[in-house]
Design a protein with these regions (language model features):
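Membrane-water interface segments that mark the loop-to-transmembrane alpha-helix transition
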Residues: 1-47, 87
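Small-residue-rich midsections of specific transmembrane alpha-helices
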Residues: 1-17, 66-72, 130-133, 162-167
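Hydrophobic transmembrane alpha-helices of multi-pass small-molecule transporters
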Residues: 4, 40, 70-73, 99-104, ...
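Membrane-interface junctions at transmembrane-helix termini in multi-pass inner-membrane proteins
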Residues: 12-20, 68-91, 142
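Membrane-interface helix caps of multi-pass small-molecule transporters
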Residues: 13, 78, 105-109, 136
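Residue-level signature of the transmembrane alpha-helical core
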Residues: 29, 33, 37, 63-67, ...
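Membrane-interface helix-loop junctions in multi-pass transport and translocation proteins
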Residues: 44, 48-60, 82-90, 94-130
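Interhelical loop/hinge segments that connect adjacent transmembrane helices in multipass membrane
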Residues: 82, 86-91, 113-120, 132-167
C-alpha cells in the first residue's frame, strides 16, 4: 500500500507532462515519503499500544525499507522512460548485491543467534540509503517541488492499480 503504484503514473507523465517530468517525479517521491512516514508513525504507535512481541526496531526498519523500495521503483521507471539503462541497471544490481554481501557478513560475524536479523537489518539499511539518495538526487535536479496537480494526476492513474497489485 505504501507504493500506491505511482510508478505507472510516472510512465504516463512522459506523455501528459512532457516538459515537467522531473518536477512530477519529485512531487511523487515527496508524497511517497510523506505518506510512508505517516504510516510508519501509525504502525509503530499501534505496535507499541498492542505490546507486540516483534521488536520495535524491526517494524521501523521494515516500514522504512518499504518506503525506500517504492522510491527506488518509481525512480527506476523514470530512468526506463528516459532510456537511461546504465543507471537503471546499476540501481537494480548494486543495492541488492551490496545488501547480500553485508547480510552474509552480518550473519557470520554479528548475529550468531538471530541470523534472520543479519538479513533484515543490512537489507533495510542499504535500501533506505539508496532511497534517500534518490530523493535528494531528484530534488537537486528539479528543486523542492510538491505540485498537487501532479499528485492528483498520479493518484488517478495509480489508485485503481493498488487492488490489482494486491491480487
Amino acid at each position: 500500500l505504501l507504493r500506491f503504484a505511482l510508478h505507472m503514473a510516472i510512465r504516463s507523465s512522459f506523455i501528459d507532462y512532457r516538459e515537467k517530468v522531473d518536477e512530477y517525479l519529485t512531487s511523487t517521491l515527496l508524497f511517497t515519503v510523506a505518506f510512508s512516514v505517516s504510516m510508519t508513525v501509525i504502525v509503530c504507535s499501534v505496535s507499541v499500544l498492542l505490546n507486540l512481541s516483534i521488536p520495535f526496531i524491526l517494524i521501523l526498519l521494515c516500514m522504512l525499507q518499504s518506503m525506500s523500495s517504492a522510491i527506488i521503483e518509481d525512480y527506476s521507471y523514470y530512468l526506463m522512460m528516459k532510456f537511461n539503462y546504465k543507471f537503471r541497471t546499476m540501481l537494480m544490481i548494486v543495492p541488492n548485491l551490496l545488501s547480500v554481501v553485508l547480510s552474509v557478513l552480518a550473519m557470520l560475524y554479528v548475529f550468531n543467534t538471530n541470523r534472520y536479523l543479519g538479513r533484515v537489518i543490512p537489507t533495510a539499511i542499504v535500501t533506505l540509503f539508496f532511497g534517500i539518495f534518490l530523493v535528494f538526487l531528484s530534488i537537486r535536479r528539479s528543486g523542492f517541488v510538491f505540485n498537487i496537480e501532479f499528485l492528483k494526476h498520479g493518484l488517478k492513474i495509480s489508485t485503481p492499480l493498488i487492488l490489482h497489485g494486491i491480487a
